[in-house]
Amino acid sequence: MRYLLSAIFILGASSAMSFVFSNIDGGNIDTKKWEGQPFLIVNTASKCGFTKQYKGLQKLFDTYRDDGFMVLAVPSNDFKQELKSNEAVKDFCELDLGLNIPMTQITSVKGNGAHPFFKWVEKEKSFIPKWNFNKILISATGEIVE
């Protein structure tokens, strides 16, 4: 049933402003709130050679958030390089790296269990993350920027 509802939702999604993620702090992150703003969604991992890119994502967020640009980190263990719990990811990112960018709970980004946003990206652009720290830039109108 979950997959059927997910498929129905994806077929109806016409822009990136149609998705809700679970916030690592609890509650939800609704991309509809970012309507009219560009944003970057990045699948991340704490134990990856690319983890150092978090620093650049934080700088990007700090530089442009007052202009309405958002950055969303989506921790994923799809490539077996993420910590085992949301709490561990949150502590690592906040305490060890000093990050305060918006972040989801650990989320699947590929395969049958992928979050509806990533299924939508696959449908729209035939793009599936092949590794950690893939960046998906969304325009202020909710379209994927290539």
Q: Where is each model-derived feature located?
A:
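Sec-dependent N-terminal signal peptides
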Residues: 3-12
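A short, compositionally biased
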Residues: 13-18, 130-131
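Amphipathic alpha-helical repeat scaffolds
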Residues: 43-47
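Structural microenvironment flanking redox-active thiols in thiol-disulfide oxidoreductases
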Residues: 50-114
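Thiol/disulfide oxidoreductase modules built on the thioredoxin-like
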Residues: 99, 107-146
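Loop/turn elements at helix/coil->beta-strand transitions in domains of secreted/extracellular proteins
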Residues: 35-39, 65-70, 97-102, 132-133, ...
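A short beta-strand-turn-helix
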Residues: 19-38, 59-64
